[in-house]
Structures are given as C-alpha cells and as structure tokens.
C-alpha cells in the first residue's frame, strides 16, 4: 500500500490528456524525438499487446507491436512519459486476455483480431 503523501504527489504527475485504450487496440503513438537542436514527431503504429493496470500509478506502461519489413518490432512505453506527445486509437479489437504475447508466434491471417462492434 502506498503512502498517502506519495499518492498525492503522483496524482499531480499523472497525465489526463491521453485517451483510454486497452490491450488489443490498434494505436498510433506520437513520440517527440530530439536531435541536437531540432525536435520532430515520430509515429509508431501497432497493436497494444500488454498494458499494466491503473493501480500502478506513475509506473504504468504499455507494449506496442508492429510488423516492419517482415520483422516484428515491439516497443515498451511508460504511459506518463513526456516523450509521448499523443496517442490515437485507430481500432478497438475484441480480445479475451490481458496479455497478447501469443501473437508473437502467429503470422498472416492467424494474427488478426476481430473488431469490436
């Protein structure tokens, strides 16, 4: 159990501008990339295969997977990171599990998920 003072400090730090999304959703994560004196936005689009629960507070994170040139790429993002400028939910899929690690072993049509109605 967390200290009340720690909870109070965390409440001020948690970002409220990001949309609500779940495991199984297709998302676009807009990242701020700094290169020397320039700053640009890079978009990482893929399927959310894992997400920590809201009980984690500031340390909440999520994992996004995409296929790039036939190779699976996964990135782990801290949800409250200042590097993330925006998150767009593209499609909500119907899933029955909290962690979709089994998708790593699937390819092609077997890796598809049904869209929520």
Curated annotation (Swiss-Prot):
It comes from the Bacteria. Coiled coil: none annotated. GO terms for molecular function: structural constituent of ribosome. HAMAP family: Ribosomal_bL19. The keyword Cytoplasm does not apply. InterPro entries: Ribosomal_bL19 (IPR001857), Ribosomal_bL19_CS (IPR018257), Ribosomal_bL19_sf (IPR038657), Translation_prot_SH3-like_sf (IPR008991). One of its GO terms (cellular component) is cytosolic large ribosomal subunit. One of its GO terms (biological process) is translation. Belongs to the bacterial ribosomal protein bL19 family. The gene is rplS. Keywords: Ribonucleoprotein, Ribosomal protein. It holds the Pfam family Ribosomal_L19. This protein is located at the 30S-50S ribosomal subunit interface and may play a role in the structure and function of the aminoacyl-tRNA binding site. This is Large ribosomal subunit protein bL19.
């Amino acid at each position: 159990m967390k200290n009340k003072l720690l909870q109070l400090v965390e409440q001020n730090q948690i970002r409220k501008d990001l949309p609500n999304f779940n495991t199984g959703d297709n998302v676009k994560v807009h990242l701020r990339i700094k290169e020397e004196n320039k700053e640009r936005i890079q978009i990482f689009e893929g399927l959310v295969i894992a997400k920590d629960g809201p009980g984690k507070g500031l340390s909440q994170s999520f994992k996004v997977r995409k296929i790039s040139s036939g190779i699976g790429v996964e990135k782990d993002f801290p949800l409250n990171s200042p590097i993330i400028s925006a998150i767009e939910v593209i499609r909500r899929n119907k899933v029955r599990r909290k962690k979709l690690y089994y998708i790593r072993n699937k390819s092609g049509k077997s890796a598809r998920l049904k869209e929520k109605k």
